[in-house]
């Protein structure tokens, strides 16, 4: 059973003071809260001097509250002409405010009009109150706030980041919290806190922090006298030039291109077809929604993270003038049986989802929502829906601007690494492009190019069907269940899709159309009137590539040759113990969830390259690590001398 997220609340006293049971009295006025946050946390960590002339600087704040620490750091960063290029703030919060209550709290505490635009931007970007990590970008992506909603200590243990400064407050000012922070601390990381108890001082000293009292606060830095960590926090990949090759111009590849270009990388995008988004990403539409399970398992948490991150990135693209077609009326996931609806209800009740994330509809409510007969109710996702994948790819490509160069109608025969540089070669051995970094986003061909023996990709044929305008009842929003139905802008209804593992036939089949018609008739009995002749229908065939656990493969690729040679020593390896091929990354195996995985996967790879905080908890990043199958083989002693 997942831990339900409990939001903070606000109450107004008779004297006009706002009080939160979670945060206590909220002090009024700019001369109070914001100034105290600056003095305690910003100045207490030696800022702004310590971030000056650096590429990135990362702050971990252990209690976001109403955002005073973040707003103070942002204001100091903006006012500093020698500021770092990119400021990351990772903020843990077990009890997030609603957007309305956050507005009330910040307005009550902070009357400084010089940051009113910052406050408005924070409120506009404030995420849904669901557990996990939420990445928000401000100032054209130069200020990044990663909100971690959930239990403070649990999340601190799961974060992946190299912290330069800690704003230590709340539950983290404890032995367990400080031990978790020590695992995140980079060289010479500093901290500042109001907590000065003997227990806090003991925990700081025990984990390698020095400390001293300055007025009413405790400050210090991370300076361990011994090596106490098995794994160091992540670093940026050492490269002499910020150039990358991305192979594959579908949803995965275009998302990576946009994220790298936004960080100042020059990218060569190689696509074997004449244009981008030519394979599964060329479908007329794709459905987009998270999963919900009673135990909030890895797949549920990953799809939630991907769903919310994609929404944020898409809105940013649209605000930047790179619009694309997507539905805006939500999506209804209908149960396939009474037992299936009971499972949906159990998952919904266990999770405690806010209404802007999901709403449970019984059969009558679902029927009223669709204005069509249905056998069961289901889950309504107000921000789910359908997206035109090719339009999204084009928007991401356009956002990359002059930093991307497309090599279309170009096939990569093999990769070679020479002198710290990867070379993409054609079948004659000629170099198509070279760069210190390569990202394989080419679905079924990725394992071949990387020489991965422990990744078994499987093709799945999917045929979709297009029903002409006027042949179906109106459908107000996409609906899914056993199959899906998506209304397109021109009145066409898209239905599908077949699921045919290991079938690589690209030809359209009347039998596939018949299967899709039969499936949607059971999903929505009143949607289609007289059945058309399947042989007369239009459609499209595309291939999705999956692995056995149906999760994507995202991240640095393992050096399987070196791992095999050291198989015995790696029998109990974690993902962080494996040797990797320097500068070689993957984003493939997305199956039918490319719209959910692509944006988050691209952000993860870009963060790994740059040594930035990851947008996923360690457990979830390990779950999509392309080396996970190698790790399982090593543990089972099925590799090399261990076999």
UniProtKB/Swiss-Prot annotation:
CC terms in the record's Gene Ontology section: cytoplasm
Gene Ontology molecular function: flavin adenine dinucleotide binding; oxidoreductase activity, acting on the CH-NH group of donors; tRNA (5-methylaminomethyl-2-thiouridylate)(34)-methyltransferase activity
InterPro entries (UniProt xref): FAD-dep_OxRdtase (IPR006076), FAD/NAD-bd_sf (IPR036188), MnmC-like_methylTransf (IPR008471), SAM-dependent_MTases_sf (IPR029063), tRNA_MAMT_biosynth_bifunc_MnmC (IPR023032), tRNA_S-uridine_synth_MnmC_C (IPR017610)
Tagged with keyword Transcription regulation: no
Main location class: cytoplasm
Keyword annotations of the record: Cytoplasm, FAD, Flavoprotein, Methyltransferase, Multifunctional enzyme, Oxidoreductase, S-adenosyl-L-methionine, Transferase, tRNA processing
EC number(s) on file: 2.1.1.61, 1.5.-.-
UniProt catalytic activity: 5-aminomethyl-2-thiouridine(34) in tRNA + S-adenosyl-L-methionine = 5-methylaminomethyl-2-thiouridine(34) in tRNA + S-adenosyl-L-homocysteine + H(+)
Subcellular location: Cytoplasm
Position of the signal peptide: none
KW Transcription regulation (keyword) present: no
UniProt region (tRNA (mnm(5)s(2)U34)-methyltransferase), positions on chain: 1-223
The protein's required cofactors: FAD
Record region (FAD-dependent cmnm(5)s(2)U34 oxidoreductase): 247-643
Similarity annotation: In the N-terminal section; belongs to the methyltransferase superfamily. tRNA (mnm(5)s(2)U34)-methyltransferase family.
Function in brief: Catalyzes the last two steps in the biosynthesis of 5-methylaminomethyl-2-thiouridine (mnm(5)s(2)U) at the wobble position (U34) in tRNA. Catalyzes the FAD-dependent demodification of cmnm(5)s(2)U34 to nm(5)s(2)U34, followed by the transfer of a methyl group from S-adenosyl-L-methionine to nm(5)s(2)U34, to form mnm(5)s(2)U34.
Protein name: tRNA 5-methylaminomethyl-2-thiouridine biosynthesis bifunctional protein MnmC
Species whose genome carries this gene: Burkholderia orbicola (strain MC0-3)
């Amino acid at each position: 059973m997942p831990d339900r997220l409990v939001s903070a609340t606000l109450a107004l006293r008779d004297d006009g003071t706002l009080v939160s049971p979670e945060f206590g009295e909220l002090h009024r006025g700019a001369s109070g809260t914001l100034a105290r946050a600056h003095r305690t946390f910003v100045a207490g960590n030696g800022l702004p001097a310590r971030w000056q002339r650096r590429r990135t600087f990362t702050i971990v704040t252990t209690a976001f509250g109403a955002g005073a620490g973040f707003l103070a750091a942002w204001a100091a960063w903006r006012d500093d002409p020698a500021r770092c290029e990119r400021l990351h703030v990772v903020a843990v919060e077990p009890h997030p405010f609603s957007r309305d209550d956050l507005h009330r709290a910040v307005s009550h505490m902070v009357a400084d009009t010089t940051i009113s635009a910052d406050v408005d931007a924070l409120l506009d970007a404030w995420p849904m109150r669901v557990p996990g990590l939420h990445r928000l970008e401000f100032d054209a992506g130069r200020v990044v706030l990663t909100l971690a909603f959930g239990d403070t200590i649990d999340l601190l243990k799961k974060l992946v980041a190299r912290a330069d400064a800690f704003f230590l407050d709340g539950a983290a000012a404890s032995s367990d919290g400080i031990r978790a922070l020590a695992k995140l601390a980079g060289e010479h990381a500093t901290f500042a806190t109001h907590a000065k108890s003997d227990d806090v001082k003991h925990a700081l000293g025990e984990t390698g922090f020095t400390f001293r009292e300055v007025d009413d606060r405790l400050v210090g830095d991370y300076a361990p006298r011994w090596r106490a960590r098995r794994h160091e926090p992540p670093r940026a990949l050492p490269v002499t030039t910020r150039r990358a090759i991305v192979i594959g111009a579908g949803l995965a590849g275009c998302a990576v291109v946009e994220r790298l270009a936004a960080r100042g990388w020059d990218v060569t995008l190689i696509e074997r077809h004449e244009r981008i988004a030519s394979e599964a990403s060329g479908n007329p539409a794709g459905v987009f929604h998270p999963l919900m399970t009673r135990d909030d398992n890895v797949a549920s948490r990953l799809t939630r993270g991907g769903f919310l991150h994609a929404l944020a990135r898409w809105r940013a693209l649209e605000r930047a003038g790179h619009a694309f077609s997507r539905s805006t009326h939500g999506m209804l996931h209908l149960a396939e049986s009474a037992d299936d609806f009971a499972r949906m209800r159990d998952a919904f009740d266990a999770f405690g989802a806010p209404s802007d994330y999901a709403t449970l509809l019984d059969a009558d409510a679902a029927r009223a929502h669709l204005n069509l007969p249905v056998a069961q109710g289901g889950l309504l996702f107000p921000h789910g829906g359908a997206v035109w994948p090719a339009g999204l790819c084009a928007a991401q490509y356009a956002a990359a601007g002059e930093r991307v160069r497309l090599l279309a109608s170009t096939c990569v025969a093999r990769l070679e690494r020479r002198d710290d540089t990867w070379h993409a070669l054609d079948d004659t051995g000629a170099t198509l492009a070279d760069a210190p970094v390569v990202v394989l986003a080419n679905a079924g061909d990725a394992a071949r190019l990387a020489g991965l023996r422990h990744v078994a990709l499987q093709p799945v044929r999917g045929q979709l069907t297009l029903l002409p305008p006027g042949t179906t009842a109106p459908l107000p929003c996409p609906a899914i269940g056993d199959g899906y139905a998506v209304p397109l802008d021109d009145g066409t209804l898209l239905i599908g899709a077949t699921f045919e593992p290991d079938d690589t036939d690209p030809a359209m089949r009347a039998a596939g159309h018949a299967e899709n018609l039969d499936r949607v008739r059971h999903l929505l009995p009143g949607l289609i009137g007289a059945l058309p002749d399947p042989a007369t229908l239009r459609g499209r065939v595309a291939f999705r590539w999956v692995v056995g656990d149906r999760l994507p493969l995202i991240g640095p690729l393992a050096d399987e040759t070196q791992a095999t040679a050291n198989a015995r020593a790696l029998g109990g390896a974690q993902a962080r113990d494996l040797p990797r091929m320097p500068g070689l990354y993957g984003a493939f195996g997305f199956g039918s969830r490319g719209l959910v995985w692509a944006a988050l996967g691209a952000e993860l790879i870009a963060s790994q390259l740059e040594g930035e905080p990851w947008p996923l908890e360690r457990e979830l990043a390990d779950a999509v690590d392309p080396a996970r199958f190698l790790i399982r083989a090593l543990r089972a002693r099925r590799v090399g001398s261990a076999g």
